[in-house]
Amino acid sequence: MTTSILDTYPQICSPNALPGTPGNLTKEQEEALLQFRSILLEKNYKERLDDSTLLRFLRARKFDINASVEMFVETERWREEYGANTIIEDYENNKEAEDKERIKLAKMYPQYYHHVDKDGRPLYFEELGGINLKKMYKITTEKQMLRNLVKEYELFATYRVPACSRRAGYLIETSCTVLDLKGISLSNAYHVLSYIKDVADISQNYYPERMGKFYIIHSPFGFSTMFKMVKPFLDPVTVSKIFILGSSYKKELLKQIPIENLPVKYGGTSVLHNPNDKFYYSDIGPWRDPRYIGPEGEIPNIFGKFTVTS
């Protein structure tokens, strides 16, 4: 993201944010940030050197400068190899075909943004429980699903973060996710855990400190035990942000999500204005509000005419 766009939204986090975030640094952390940037400049890196990005890497490595440099260098290598630097442009060049697949997939595997949580973070829902993997993999592949994830991370940083930060009046860096496993079979749960691990690998290795809260609701009996098998492969910081809930989740969700922003099906009061609209086509938030859209422009409309914007 260019410096000019960074200048159009807050670059300081809320005073209540965690230590080590922009605006909440100790003298030692400030010195580590300067040294980290200096090393990267010496290595001829020129992109993604803003305070917010560098501090996310430093926090992920507990302000160990050498480990943070190693992580940043590996991420830049991966970005080039995977195509993350051009993934939005590639999508725009193949928008019609990708959107057709995404619209079909949305009915089988609803994934949507719907307003913000109490901290002003984008609120993201995934309804993974009712999917039929055999049918879904006739439309897409796990590889493509992970590529869609990377594309969403890039869209998140480019469009959702700036708009949410302008609305909140302070820097928003993370999201709040609700993963609904209602109806999932235990056999499918193994595949789900494998997918969650792949998602977590990409998240914690290449997009550090983007996860704010991650709620897994309607988790079936035995899921927590299965999760313990995956936990050793996840960063402890990532694990601390994951909350596995059963069917009694409403009270916990409402601690973090305004009742007016939580869909009725999850115990809130939020409904779509047009009864013919579907939540899996929803994309409601500051990133669609002209008051908060800056020089980055409006986020691409993946669902075309289906997208709910108010």
UniProtKB/Swiss-Prot annotation:
It comes from the Eukaryota. GO terms for biological process: post-Golgi vesicle-mediated transport. One of its GO terms (molecular function) is phosphatidylinositol transfer activity. Residues 101-274 form the CRAL-TRIO domain. InterPro entries: CRAL-TRIO_dom, CRAL-TRIO_dom_sf, CRAL/TRIO_N_dom, CRAL/TRIO_N_dom_sf, PI/PC_transfer. GO terms for cellular component: nucleus. It comes from Saccharomyces cerevisiae (strain ATCC 204508 / S288c). SMART domains: CRAL_TRIO_N (SM01100), SEC14 (SM00516). This is CRAL-TRIO domain-containing protein YKL091C. CDD domains: SEC14. Gene3D superfamilies: CRAL-TRIO lipid binding domain (3.40.525.10), N-terminal domain of phosphatidylinositol transfer protein sec14p (1.10.8.20). Present with 2870 molecules/cell in log phase SD medium.
